[in-house]
Amino acid sequence: MKAATFGQVTVAALTASLLAACGGSDNNDDSVSQTATFNLGISDAPIDAAEAVVVCFNAVELTGQGQPIQYEVGVDVEVPAENDLCRDSNGDVIANTIGIDLLQFTGSEQTQFLQDATIAAGNYGQLRLVMGEGSYASVDLDGDGTTTDVPVSVPSNELKLDGFTADAGGNLNYTAEFDLRQGMTNPVGQEGFILKPRGVRLVDNSSVGHLQGSVSEELLLNETSCEVAPADLTTPVAYIYLYEGIGYDLSALADIGGSEQQQPYASTAVYFDGAASYDFQI
């Protein structure tokens, strides 16, 4: 059987990488190991006004090569051990679940979620993150500095991401990238937040990078809505939006939830450093 090693999966968005451990060969020499390594990480783009966004994961599932392959928290060695961040309504720890605070892994930071998993070579139609119960966001609802834990739910308890191809002998590294400003909503009339798949994408680490820079104070001063020197340096002073393509007219560029033609690919906040610089990383 041709196989690939699914080496490492990380979340914070989520990154995964696939490495070729051995050269691929079409002969029947069983001494040639046709495997690939898959790594997955998780990472996030920050969300406004939240102190924590803890998402509870139960498993990673790969589909497209016969029966789905599932790696379950607390059962399989390729995924991290369960922790005590996910609790039910009685305060009891939910078994076989790991809670990850996405706000701890923003920008280029990530946490490992799947490591050294051996999978059959071939095309995989989807990577699914199977969610557990107990996800929540800690937010300041009244602006008084006190946070409240608000439930976060995921439709169908699964985040279905794009697929990938595992070549025999390959080593893949991917990230499941969460953009909570796009994917987490608080519908009117409903309790809690909803985390939608549109705010999560599977990214090949070998083909992406991160941008960082600063915004001029003059530009911010020209925008009357920007508070350029907040007392709390964790308060964003502005936001940066990244779009796919070039040459667009400014009037065609939408912000998060806007109706204009060109929707942002990603976004991030700009922060004042307390001295003279306004910095961002995306």
Region roles according to the model:
Residues 1-11:
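Bacterial N-terminal signal peptides that target proteins for export
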Residues 13-16:
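Short, linear, compositionally biased motifs with a strong N-terminal bias
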Residues 18-21:
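C-terminal motif of bacterial Sec signal peptides marking the signal peptidase cleavage site
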Residues 23-281:
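A short, solvent-exposed, low-complexity linear motif enriched for acidic/polar residues
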